[in-house]
């Protein structure tokens, strides 16, 4: 395939044009008065959004050289979104400002490598400033504020705060479509897994077709149970206590199943059998989770424990177990809280190490079940277009809230970025030549988000920046929604520190790469050949 090449200044100008086209489409969405963008879809209704990364992802330019610049900005937005879940528009605005200033200096004869070095040094100091100024979340109200700002809706903020309140920081919160127009939170407490009773004869509530066992003993094994002889000693021990038993095994069949069913029907021993959740190694891990949650032991040949030797202490305990046709819920497991914490920490470190998204989701789900439950935010809307947009905002707000829990919060509205210029001023004193010019590029870019927020709300950015910098209060800023100056923390205008920091670092990374680019290589478009003339009709 033949290639087209473009060099030096011409190459960088093409990249800049592509960057500007994407950034101009994205930056109008910044802040509480940001505008919407309507995106055509090849099928179905168009999407209306003010989410930076969604807009950037949709843009593909006709000019192949310009498109390379557009792809670089997309990279800034999606990388920030992947790491922090929000801040994509801020990252794009910062990147555009750095690239514009940087290219001016390269055209004037500055050394791009030294400029990049200056940009990196200034960014490092500003990012450290942001991290140091972060304040830990102090409760439900802070969580609601962070989520409300990300989603641009206090109603969504309250929903996310309610969900986090119920499941804790490590809990799983999922977003699903609601069957009504309402948006609400549904909560499932305890550990739930998708395996139901093996036989309907175990049912204790015929109306609901479910089994409810109060304060049961729980036998957990990875074996297939078919013979009854190995089971008899443990069943006799449980029968003497007068409590019910739940058997979780690879499978229960034949004599073993018949014995459990007959004991249940005769009223000798209330029992229920379910298959173990998952497959292969995942099954082993989930059985171990259940054992730790309930304070039991997994009866396994690998551990050298035989069913005949099982003591009552090897069985798990819980307050209530509910078993339906397709799922089982264990509520109030009696496991050692310290052991449960250790297991959660172990799963957390596995999440950090894994690169597979599917694996990550599965591990998070396991962690949530150990932590005590799953919250589902059911999203309702009048039209499909509104539903898609609302769902997307909630998912974004959830990610931003998790980022805030992780690294803390800083004053929002671009205030922290402009205040971080103090840290860059210290770097400027140490540098000279083109490195100093590079640091100055970052210094100027740090005011771009606040300027854009003001302009989107119909105010003069320069006037607002001057007024904010005149105040010594670090959290003093401009509330663009109400059009007044205020303490950002008190007004609840806060951003997760991780979002602000990631936006700056990703913008600087792409700007540095673009400034040091000398050559562009793209595929030459194929020339469309004229179609052959139609055959003359036959007579």
Curated annotation (Swiss-Prot):
One of its GO terms (molecular function) is ATP binding. Its main location: cytoplasm. InterPro entries: Chaperonin_Cpn60_CS, Cpn60/GroEL, Cpn60/GroEL/TCP-1, GroEL-like_apical_dom_sf, GROEL-like_equatorial_sf, TCP-1-like_intermed_sf. It catalyses: ATP + H2O + a folded polypeptide = ADP + phosphate + an unfolded polypeptide. The keyword Isomerase applies. Disulfide bonds: none annotated. Keywords: ATP-binding, Chaperone, Cytoplasm, Isomerase, Nucleotide-binding. SUPFAM superfamilies: GroEL apical domain-like, GroEL equatorial domain-like, GroEL-intermediate domain like. It is found in: Cytoplasm. Belongs to the chaperonin (HSP60) family. Together with its co-chaperonin GroES, plays an essential role in assisting protein folding. The GroEL-GroES system forms a nano-cage that allows encapsulation of the non-native substrate proteins and provides a physical environment optimized to promote and accelerate protein folding. HAMAP family: CH60 (MF_00600). This is Chaperonin GroEL.
């Amino acid at each position: 395939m033949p290639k087209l090449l473009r060099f030096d200044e011409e190459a960088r100008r093409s990249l800049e044009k592509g960057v500007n086209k994407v950034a101009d489409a994205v930056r109008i969405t910044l802040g509480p008065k940001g505008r919407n963008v309507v995106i055509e879809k090849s099928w179905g209704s168009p999407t209306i959004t003010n989410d930076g990364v969604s807009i950037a992802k949709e843009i593909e330019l006709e000019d192949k050289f310009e498109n390379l610049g557009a792809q670089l900005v997309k990279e800034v937005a999606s990388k920030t979104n992947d790491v922090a879940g929000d801040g994509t528009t801020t990252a794009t605005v910062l990147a555009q400002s750095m690239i514009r200033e940087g290219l001016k200096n390269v055209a004037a004869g500055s050394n791009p490598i030294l400029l990049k070095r200056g940009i990196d040094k200034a960014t490092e100091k500003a990012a450290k400033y942001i991290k140091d100024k972060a304040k830990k979340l102090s409760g439900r109200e802070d969580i609601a504020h962070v989520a409300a700002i990300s989603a641009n809706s206090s109603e969504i903020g309250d929903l996310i705060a309610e969900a986090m309140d119920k499941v804790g920081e490590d809990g799983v919160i999922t977003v699903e479509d609601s069957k009504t127009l309402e948006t609400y939170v549904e909560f499932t407490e305890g550990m739930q897994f998708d395996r139901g009773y093996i036989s309907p004869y175990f049912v204790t509530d015929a109306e609901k077709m479910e089994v409810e066992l109060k304060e049961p003993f729980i036998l957990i094994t990875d074996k297939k149970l078919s013979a009854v002889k190995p089971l008899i000693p443990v069943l006799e021990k449980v029968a003497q206590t007068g409590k019910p038993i739940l058997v979780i095994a690879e499978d229960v069949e034949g004599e073993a199943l018949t014995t459990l069913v007959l004991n249940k029907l005769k009223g000798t021993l209330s029992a229920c059998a379910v298959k173990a959740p998952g497959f292969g190694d995942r099954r082993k891990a989930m059985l171990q989770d259940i054992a730790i949650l309930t304070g039991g032991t997994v009866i396994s040949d690998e551990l050298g424990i035989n069913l005949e030797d099982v003591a009552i202490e090897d069985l798990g305990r819980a307050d209530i177990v509910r078993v339906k046709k397709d799922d089982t819920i264990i509520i109030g497991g009696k496991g050692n809280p310290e052991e449960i914490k250790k297991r959660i920490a172990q799963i957390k470190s596995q999440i950090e190490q894994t690169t597979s998204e599917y694996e990550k989701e599965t591990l998070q789900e396991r962690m949530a079940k150990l932590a005590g439950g799953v919250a589902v935010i059911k999203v309702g809307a009048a039209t499909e277009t509104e539903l898609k947009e609302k769902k997307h905002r909630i998912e974004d707000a959830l990610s931003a809230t998790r980022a805030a829990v992780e690294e803390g919060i800083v004053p929002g509205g671009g205030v922290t970025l402009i205040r971080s210029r103090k840290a860059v001023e210290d770097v400027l004193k140490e540098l000279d030549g083109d490195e100093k010019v590079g640091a100055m590029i970052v210094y100027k870019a740090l005011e771009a988000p606040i300027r854009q927020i003001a302009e989107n709300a119909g105010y003069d950015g320069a006037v607002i920046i001057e007024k904010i910098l005149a105040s010594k209060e670090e959290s003093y800023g401009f509330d663009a929604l109400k059009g007044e100056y205020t303490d950002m923390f008190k007004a609840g205008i806060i951003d997760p520190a991780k979002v602000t920091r990631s936006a700056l670092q990703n913008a600087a990374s792409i700007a540095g790469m673009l400034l040091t680019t000398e050559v562009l290589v793209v595929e030459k478009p194929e020339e469309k050949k004229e179609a052959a003339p139609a055959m003359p009709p036959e007579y």
